[in-house]
């Protein structure tokens, strides 16, 4: 397939390889009913994360976590140990089949969104898991394929994100799939396992029609924010990931215009310059996560939050997608009258508009996350729309002129 080719989403022969791209740059896509979700955004990414679908973060959905029998467990690893493998497999299968459904994808499409980012863990390639020392749910890949099929039919662009890396890329955080005491990812053994995963998922993406709208693969989410400690990641893992992904694509005779975009956290993230050791930057992309609530340099006031967001220039590397952000504020003020969600909707509307205005100076944005069980909208796009804070027509937020 050639650059700028138009792809209509029709059934493909099983032997046909599926290609990757950036929407409206490399090709145009439409849903099965003929809708081009990128037409209104002029090619900008506007998306939501599928948080807790395949890498469960208990804080997002404590009720669902408890119903699985995982109450009190810190991570997927811990829950599988507690339940036992067979019981855990059944519990997680029920979760995978109910947390994000085809109805969710239809609703996402209806809100003028055009992209989903799907966090996944290396344990989805089950033969990578050391059965004596590592414990993760089994059977997730079939549900990933089903989800991506729904999204492709809807005309949504898909980013797959290695959220949980072997050994854990950061300690004490369930988004790695395990509540590890130390970050064990940064060595040749764990890099090797991650590379095997990247080869495998790349091959799966190009071989299945369900993955036809997967155009980007993030090779590790949120590594340590310490450039010195992760030097080997930049010098070894990043270049090797490019080589292994491209080799897998070449083995399948994928044309260069059909390659996956390979995504890394940008320089602003704090893990050093991702380009430092790269010799091949073809179809490279970058990710930035912007949470003002955790930025100690930002004074906490509503006026400052809006002005800071309006002035954000997240262009340390290009093209950059702001792959995580929210409407959440520091915990010590979140419940105070000045920041109350019910009485300050006008502020949250403006702050949403300010953030997307800034992020669309770059390639676009993906909100964290689509849905939660937190009882509010600051972390939940679905609930923010229901509350009237986020409009169904995203352009109407941009047209508010908050940053003018």
Swiss-Prot record:
One of its GO terms (molecular function) is glucan endo-1,6-beta-glucosidase activity. This is Probable glucan endo-1,6-beta-glucosidase B. GO terms for biological process: cell wall organization; glucan catabolic process. GO terms for cellular component: cell surface; extracellular region. It comes from Aspergillus terreus (strain NIH 2624 / FGSC A1156). It catalyses: Random hydrolysis of (1->6)-linkages in (1->6)-beta-D-glucans. Pfam families: Cellulase. Glycans are attached at residues 33, 130, 253, 299. It is found in: Secreted. Its main location: secreted.
């Amino acid at each position: 397939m050639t650059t700028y080719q138009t792809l209509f989403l029709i059934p493909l022969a099983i032997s046909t390889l599926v290609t990757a791209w950036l929407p409206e740059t490399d090709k145009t896509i439409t849903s099965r009913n003929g809708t081009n979700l990128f037409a209104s955004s002029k090619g900008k990414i506007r998306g939501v994360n599928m948080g807790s679908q395949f890498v469960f973060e208990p804080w997002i959905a404590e009720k669902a976590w408890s119903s699985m029998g995982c109450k009190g467990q810190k991570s997927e690893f811990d829950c599988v140990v507690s339940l036992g493998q067979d019981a855990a497999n059944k519990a997680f299968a029920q979760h995978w089949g109910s947390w994000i459904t085809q109805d969710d994808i239809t609703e996402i499409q209806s809100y003028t969104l055009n992209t989903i980012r799907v966090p996944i863990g290396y344990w989805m390639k089950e033969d990578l898991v050391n059965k004596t020392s590592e414990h993760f749910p089994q059977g997730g890949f079939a549900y990933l394929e089903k989800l991506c099929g729904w999204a492709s039919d809807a005309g949504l662009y898909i980013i797959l994100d290695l959220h949980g890396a072997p050994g854990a890329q950061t300690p004490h955080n369930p988004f790695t799939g395990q509540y590890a005491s130390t970050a064990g990812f940064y060595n040749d053994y764990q890099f090797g396992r991650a590379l095997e995963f990247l080869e495998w998922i790349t091959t799966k993406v190009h071989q299945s029609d369900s993955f036809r709208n997967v155009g980007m693969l993030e090779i590790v989410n949120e590594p340590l924010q310490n450039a010195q400690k992760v030097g080997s990641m930049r010098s070894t893992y990043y270049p090797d990931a490019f080589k292994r992904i491209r080799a897998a694509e070449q083995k399948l005779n994928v044309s260069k215009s059909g390659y996956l975009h390979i995504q890394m956290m940008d320089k602003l993230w704090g893990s050093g310059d991702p380009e430092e050791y790269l010799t091949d930057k073809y179809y490279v992309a970058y990710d930035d996560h912007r949470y003002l609530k955790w930025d100690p340099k930002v004074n906490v006031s509503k006026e400052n939050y809006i002005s800071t967001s309006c002035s954000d220039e997240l262009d340390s590397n290009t093209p950059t997608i702001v792959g995580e952000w929210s409407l959440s504020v520091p915990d010590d003020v979140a419940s105070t009258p000045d920041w109350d969600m019910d009485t300050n909707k006008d502020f949250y509307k403006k702050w949403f508009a300010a953030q997307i205005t800034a992020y669309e100076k770059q390639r676009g944005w993906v909100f964290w996350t689509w849905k939660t069980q937190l009882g509010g909208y600051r972390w939940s796009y679905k609930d923010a729309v229901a509350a009237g804070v986020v409009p169904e027509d995203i352009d109407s937020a941009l047209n508010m002129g908050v940053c003018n």
